[in-house]
């Protein structure tokens, strides 16, 4: 039986769609319109007008329908998406464009003229398209801003471009207002995609107006609907058509590039027109039906071509409902696009859905080939809409096996596109040079990496090219422009390619020696090779990886001693053990450790072409010799992992739990069998918080039991403990609260979800109001998190207080038993200050009891008898313990930080009512309108609804908010006394040596400044004359923070108090002053005037530091300093309640919140020297 080829199946699909699908038939491009658009001499606005007139009655653009939804609990109204799209015609779209153009053009005070700049901040939508097209109509220069960019970056761009007008969605109004208040030039702020019926959107709009008005700003704030209404009654604005010989600027696309400094790629009128006229696979040839879903930002060239390429063909451009891709596949299923541009991340999401469906449907005896076909057919028809005719992938390399998988799902070729903002979106397609737009290309030698045009069998080198779509340069950056072109005018791509034949190129590598792995982590392979070469068993090592992979491999030449007396298996085990030991000693990250390796007994030499004349590894030659074997190893590892995980899912019911847990960890982390001991820790095997998240999800799939990340990474838990935890959960019969059981699904969480009856039994809740209050003053205090950075100083404060009265401090610390827990706590005070350690030990001997427990466990991990003893004897609870992780999502922090706090509440309302001191975070304010924020207001009202997303610290902030909500509920239930402390940066202890938080960003910065000896002229944006501005750094010493929390917590024997633990002064004490103090103390630090120059020199210097210093440096957080900060005077949040309480209680030497001082900064240096980091 003959099997259809993919092309035959595609042709049959096309014929069927044109015969049966009315939407597809109606979207066929018109030859007359296509010819007019492509006619020589057509200018950008003429093309747009021609398209809009030629397809006037067709549907042009579609967005998700919505309805208004009022929350019964809060009374707030929001938009709820409906499972359908609504469209407008080309005529209606162009009418909207005309209204906006007329309003702007005829504005009596600030008319917009050709050449003026308009900046847009938001996600792609019909309103966004309207504004963009209005710019085209008038000849204005569009500046699409990256919605994810830091405010400092946005300000830099707006300062450089001086736009007359800034348009923003409600979601980004805070950033827009920050830019305007920073003194940028827009005269108007237009708010688009605005629905005043939505309470949050209306609040954002009103807040923006109020903030600008309060600041005395003259910026006019109005909605796009108001602009359109004004323009509706005005004469039409003239269509901008430049003179024949004129090619004015039409668009700036800003890209950070490799330097991190925003650079505006200039698109002239002619270049911008090619986005409509192009005939590339991405844009679509003039006869291809275009129905697509636009999910890429308009600040990216692919996003713009995706939109305009479809409109130019008379198709329908639908817009994704949300920018975070949370509705992407729901949107795709509703739209059923005929074409799509994939990015690798979306391919990963499809594959994850495939794996999940495959596992869900797998049953014993199922035919895997049949199941594979069924799942892929279901994905193709339902998940992806079932009528794709063209699919393209781009923006980053896609692994070959992923490409094969996607093609098998789509039943279509997945075309591989290569381009860039500077060169144009369509330079290569399926490795073939695209002519047009490419006019010429060449390869140039890269001798430092060993790539030459004389290489055989194929020439290799950096790709340089000339193309019709290449930008003329960067806006106002002549020096940077000069760097990206050679003397013959060829654009330097920075990419190494191999020329298989004329016009057929294959991507090889980036010229930069720093390798970016697929998860976004950068590794310096030469550095890693040097680290591992220190092993007595390793003679030479070649590290191998690519941007398509998340982990590294290696080729190892063993030493003669290593080879002597060992067979292959024993040798490999010895080498693997050596690598792990060296990695641990060097504090390498898991992604920096090769997961597997080839053993080569022939050394790399000059003679065999693997070393250069100065004995450097010749990477191209090494890749040529070992590349195929290493790629096969990647394939084998992936296959082995998938097979093992599938086997585990099937066999888990018949295997001991410990065996399943160990095999799952082995498969997920790719470690050797010899390392899989029952007493091994997940983190010691190379796991980190992200891999722990995947492991947690896997264990839940296998066992049907929630295994939080905190349990996986707990230093008290070995693999056998994880197995015991799972067995206990399976046998308990009781289900602990989870994110889903409390909040349901979705991306919003509500304070109303967090009711105590979801966490605490009815009997305890019913009795809470009738139990006696704990005695005052407290004599028995329970402290969680005592071995944490702040926790240790709270421990010391309470030991000192209770020692005077004969009281007892009980600390719950993670550990396999009480002795191990006590050892962990003791080590927190052993920082190199003998006086501190002796003081602690003397107090502890008289006053301290340590229990082994875990806040994430039922009963805090304590047995019933101990729990009951605490319930009956504890007088006050201090709860700073939390899983502090700014990467993990709320779902994973829910167990330790929310359920754990609920257990604290349960203890507090059992047997006697015990006041609670709770440590929260200023991150709670992250999702609160600054105008609505009050220090002591009820968080349930101030932040009733919050968004769950994957942004930095979102999960942690939400988890601490949830803890506050639960405590508010407990207070309402029975008058439980509560004191909440929202802390910001907690700095070093003022007195005790070595006591500073090595992991926090401030310590890392001080270390990096002193170690590199360079600092910027100012960390903040300078004034118009280039002078330093008055600024403030918000932080408090750990000892004052602990003293304040303890003193105020003792007083909280009734009521509910909330304090923002901040340094609120407009005192001019900032990062700049810290550098001044360091210089005055004799540390040789050079100030660099140009901030960008400093940043790049700083990064280079940090990367060159010794390994121990580099690991403790600011390198992982360096992006925070990529651009100068706004000069903020005073604290970001109010702290009046806290300051008044501190003054009344006379806390600290000054009986007030202290100012930061030079001695504290000097102590940072001495502490880092004591810890041998400086």
UniProtKB/Swiss-Prot annotation:
Q: How is the cofactor bound?
A: Binds 1 phosphopantetheine covalently.
The entry marks the following residues as binding NADP(+), namely: 787-790, 814, 824, 880-882, 920, 956, 960, 983
Pfam families, sorted: AMP-binding, NAD_binding_4, PP-binding
Q: Name one GO biological process term.
A: biosynthetic process
Q: How is its activity regulated?
A: Is competitively inhibited by anthranilate when using benzoate as substrate.
For this chain, the Swiss-Prot or TrEMBL PTM comment says:
4'-phosphopantetheine is transferred from CoA to Ser-689 by Npt.
Q: What is one term from the GO cellular component aspect held by the record?
A: membrane
Cofactor(s) for this UniProt protein: pantetheine 4'-phosphate
Superkingdom of the organism of origin: Bacteria
- Residues bearing O-(pantetheine 4'-phosphoryl)serine? 689
What are the recorded GO MF terms, alphabetically?
aryl-aldehyde dehydrogenase (NADP+) activity; ATP binding; long-chain fatty acid-CoA ligase activity; NADP binding; phosphopantetheine binding
Q: Which residues are in the Carrier domain? A: 655-730
Q: Which UniProt keywords apply?
A: ATP-binding, NADP, Nucleotide-binding, Oxidoreductase, Phosphopantetheine, Phosphoprotein
What reaction(s) does this enzyme catalyze? Answer: a carboxylate + ATP + NADPH + H(+) = an aldehyde + AMP + diphosphate + NADP(+); an aromatic aldehyde + AMP + diphosphate + NADP(+) = an aromatic carboxylate + ATP + NADPH + H(+)
The family database entries (PROSITE patterns) matched by this protein are listed as: ADH_SHORT, AMP_BINDING, CARRIER
EC number(s) stated in the UniProt entry for this protein: 1.2.1.-, 1.2.1.30
Q: For binding AMP, which residues are annotated in this chain's numbering?
A: 300, 395, 416-417, 421, 495, 507-510, 516, 616
Subunit structure, as described in the record? Monomer.
Q: Please give the function described in this protein's UniProt entry.
A: Catalyzes the ATP- and NADPH-dependent reduction of carboxylic acids to the corresponding aldehydes. Catalyzes the reduction of a very wide range of aliphatic carboxylic acids as well as many aryl carboxylic acids. Aryl carboxylic acid substrates include substituted benzoic acids, phenyl-substituted aliphatic acids, heterocyclic carboxylic acids, and polyaromatic ring carboxylic acids. Cannot reduce benzaldehyde to benzyl alcohol.
Annotated domain remarks: The N-terminal domain likely catalyzes substrate activation by formation of an initial acyl-AMP intermediate, the central region contains the phosphopantetheine attachment site, and the C-terminal domain catalyzes the reduction by NADPH of the intermediate thioester formed from the attack of the phosphopantetheine thiol at the carbonyl carbon of acyl-AMP. Large-scale domain motions occur between the adenylation and thiolation states. Phosphopantetheine binding alters the orientation of a key Asp, resulting in a productive orientation of the bound nicotinamide.
Q: Which family does it belong to?
A: Belongs to the ATP-dependent AMP-binding enzyme family. Carboxylic acid reductase subfamily.
The cross-references to HAMAP family, in alphabetical order and at most eight, read: Carbox_acid_reduct
The remark listed among the other comments is: The conversion of carboxylic acid into aldehyde involves three key steps: adenylation of the bound carboxylic acid substrate to form an AMP-acyl intermediate, formation of a thioester linkage between the acyl moiety and the phosphopantetheine prosthetic group, and reduction of the thioester intermediate to the aldehyde.
The name this protein goes by in its record? Carboxylic acid reductase
């Amino acid at each position: 039986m003959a099997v259809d080829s993919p092309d035959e199946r595609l042709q049959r699909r096309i014929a069927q769609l044109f015969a049966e699908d009315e939407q597809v038939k109606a979207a066929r491009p018109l030859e007359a319109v296509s010819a007019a658009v492509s006619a020589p001499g057509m200018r950008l606005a003429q093309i747009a007008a021609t398209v809009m007139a030629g397809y006037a009655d067709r549907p042009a653009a579609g967005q998700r329908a919505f309805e208004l939804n009022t929350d019964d609990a809060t009374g707030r109204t929001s938009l709820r998406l409906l499972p359908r799209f609504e469209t407008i015609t080309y005529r209606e779209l162009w009418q909207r464009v005309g209204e906006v153009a007329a309003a702007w053009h005829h504005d009596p005070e600030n008319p917009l003229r050709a050449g003026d700049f308009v900046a847009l901040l938001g996600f792609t939508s019909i309103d966004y398209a309207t504004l963009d097209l209005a710019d085209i109509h008038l000849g204005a220069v569009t500046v699409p801003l990256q919605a994810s960019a830091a405010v400092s970056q946005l300000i830099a761009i707006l300062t450089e471009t001086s736009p007359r007008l800034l348009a923003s969605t409600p979601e980004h109004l805070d950033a827009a207002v920050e830019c305007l208040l920073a003194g940028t030039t827009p005269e108007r702020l237009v708010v688009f995609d605005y629905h005043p019926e939505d309470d949050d959107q209306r609040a954002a709009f009103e807040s923006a107006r109020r903030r600008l008005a309060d600041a005395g700003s003259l910026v006019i704030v109005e909605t796009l609907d108001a602009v359109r209404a004004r323009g509706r009654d005005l004469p039409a604005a003239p269509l901008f058509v430049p003179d024949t010989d004129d090619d004015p600027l039409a668009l700036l696309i800003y890209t950070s590039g490799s330097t991190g400094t925003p650079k505006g790629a200039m698109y002239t009128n002619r270049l911008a027109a090619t986005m409509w006229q192009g005939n590339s696979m991405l844009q679509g040839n003039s006869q291809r039906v275009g129905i697509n879903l636009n999910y890429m930002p308009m600040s990216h060239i692919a996003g713009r071509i995706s939109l305009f390429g479809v409109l130019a063909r008379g198709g329908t451009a639908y817009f994704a409902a949300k920018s975070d891709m949370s509705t992407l596949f729901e949107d795709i299923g509703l739209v059923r696009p005929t074409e799509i541009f994939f990015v690798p991340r979306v391919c990963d999401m499809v594959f994850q859905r495939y794996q999940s469906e495959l596992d869900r449907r797998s049953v014993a005896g199922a035919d895997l080939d049949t199941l594979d076909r069924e799942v892929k057919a279901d994905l193709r028809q339902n998940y992806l809409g079932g009528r794709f005719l063209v699919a393209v992938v781009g923006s980053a390399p896609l692994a070959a096996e992923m490409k094969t998988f996607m093609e098998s799902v789509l039943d279509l070729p997945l075309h591989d596109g290569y381009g860039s903002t500077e060169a144009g979106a369509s330079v290569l397609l399926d490795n073939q040079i695209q002519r047009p737009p490419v006019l010429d290309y060449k390869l140039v030698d890269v001798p430092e990496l060993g790539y030459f045009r004389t290489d055989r069998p194929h020439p290799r080198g950096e790709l340089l090219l000339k193309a019709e779509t290449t930008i003329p340069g960067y806006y106002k950056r002549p020096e940077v422009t000069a760097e990206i072109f050679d003397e013959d005018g060829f654009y330097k791509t920075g990419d190494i390619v191999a020329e298989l034949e004329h016009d057929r190129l294959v991507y090889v590598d980036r010229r930069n020696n720093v390798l970016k792995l697929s998860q976004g982590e950068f590794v310096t392979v030469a550095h890693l090779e040097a680290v591992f070469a220190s092993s007595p068993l390793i003679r030479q090592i070649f590290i191998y990886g690519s941007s398509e992979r998340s982990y590294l491999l290696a080729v190892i030449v063993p030493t003669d001693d290593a080879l002597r007396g060992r067979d292959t298996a024993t040798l490999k085990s010895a080498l693997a053990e050596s690598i792990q030991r060296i990695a641990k000693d060097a504090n390498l990250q898991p992604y920096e450790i090769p997961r597997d390796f080839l053993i080569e007994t022939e050394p790399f030499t000059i003679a065999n072409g693997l070393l250069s004349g100065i004995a450097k590894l010749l990477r191209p030659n090494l890749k040529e010799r070992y590349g195929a074997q290493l790629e096969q190893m990647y394939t084998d590892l992936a296959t082995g992992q998938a097979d093992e995980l599938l086997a585990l899912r099937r066999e888990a019911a018949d295997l001991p739990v410990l065996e399943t847990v160990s095999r799952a960890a082995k498969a997920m982390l790719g470690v050797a069998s010899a390392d899989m001991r029952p007493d091994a820790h997940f983190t010691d095997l190379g796991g980190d918080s992200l891999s722990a998240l995947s492991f947690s999800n896997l264990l839940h799939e296998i066992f049907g039991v929630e295994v939080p990340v905190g349990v996986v990474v707990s230093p008290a838990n070995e693999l056998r403990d994880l197995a015991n935890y799972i067995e206990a959960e399976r046998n308990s019969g009781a289900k602990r609260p989870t994110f889903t059981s409390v909040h349901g699904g979705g991306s919003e969480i509500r304070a109303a979800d967090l009711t105590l009856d979801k966490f605490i039994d009815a009997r305890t809740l019913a009795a809470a109001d009738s139990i006696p209050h704990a005695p005052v003053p407290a004599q028995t205090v329970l402290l969680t998190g005592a071995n944490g950075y702040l926790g240790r100083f709270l421990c010391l404060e309470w030991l000192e207080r209770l020692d005077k009265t004969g009281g007892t401090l009980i600390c719950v610390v993670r550990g396999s038993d009480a002795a191990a827990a006590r050892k962990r706590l003791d080590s927190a005070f052993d920082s190199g200050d003998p006086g501190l350690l002796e003081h602690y030990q003397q107090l502890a001997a008289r006053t301290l009891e340590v229990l082994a427990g875990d806040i994430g466990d039922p009963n805090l991990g304590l047995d019933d008898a101990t729990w009951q003893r605490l319930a009956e004897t504890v007088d006050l609870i201090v709860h700073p313990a939390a899983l502090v992780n700014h990467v993990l999502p709320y779902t994973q922090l829910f167990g330790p930080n929310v359920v754990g706090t609920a257990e604290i509440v349960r203890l507090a309302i059992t047997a006697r009512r015990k006041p609670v001191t709770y440590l929260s975070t200023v991150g709670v304010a992250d999702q609160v309108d600054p105008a609505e924020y009050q220090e002591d207001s009820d968080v349930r009202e101030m932040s009733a609804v919050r968004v769950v997303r994957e942004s930095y610290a979102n999960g942690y902030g939400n988890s601490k908010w949830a803890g506050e909500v639960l405590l508010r509920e407990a207070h309402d239930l029975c008058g439980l006394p509560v004191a909440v402390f929202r802390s910001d940066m907690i700095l070093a202890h003022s007195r005790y040596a070595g006591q500073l938080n090595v992991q926090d960003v401030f310590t890392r910065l001080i270390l990096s400044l002193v170690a590199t000896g360079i600092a910027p002229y100012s960390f903040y944006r300078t004034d118009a004359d280039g002078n330093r501005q008055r600024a403030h750094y918000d932080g408090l010493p750990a000892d004052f923070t602990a003293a304040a929390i303890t003193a105020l917590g003792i007083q909280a024997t009734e009521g509910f108090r909330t304090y923002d633990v901040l340094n609120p002064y407009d005192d001019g004490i900032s990062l700049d002053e810290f550098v001044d103090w360091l210089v005055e103390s004799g540390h040789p630090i050079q100030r660099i005037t140009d901030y960008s120059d400093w940043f790049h020199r700083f990064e280079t210097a940090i990367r060159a530091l010794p390994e121990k210093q580099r690991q403790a440096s600011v390198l992982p957080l360096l992006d925070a300093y990529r651009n100068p900060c706004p000069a903020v005077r005073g604290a970001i949040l109010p702290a009046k309640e806290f300051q008044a309480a501190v003054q009344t209680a006379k806390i600290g030497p000054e009986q007030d919140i202290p100012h930061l001082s030079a001695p504290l900064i000097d102590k940072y240096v001495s502490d880092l020297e004591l810890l041998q980091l400086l």
